[in-house]
């Protein structure tokens, strides 16, 4: 797949699709570092802003992590905790507050699951590490 500047699809979306495909195929394995912004820009002959936007999109999807000065890498598959919902409980998915994101070390774009127990107790869990089970 190549970036087509004449396409109706924005360049950053094309690059995000290309990188996503390489991640999903295993060409960029979990934990591996992606090429730098400059390398991607030069390799695909596109502007650095398009690269930044593509990386931001993949980060919001939870596929990659970025760290200033350290680079960008593919997220490892996370172990999921199985939580059994008790009768009378409810669960919703929502975006975390900045405090929750910091406390749970959540990447941008990762939701939380808020569970309300039958007695009104509230638990907030990372959405990418939680699997809900109905009894």
Map each language-model feature to its residues:
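Residues in the helix-turn-helix
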Residues: 50, 57
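Short, structured interface segments
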Residues: 69-75
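Beta-hairpin "wing" of winged helix-turn-helix
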Residues: 28, 32, 61-69
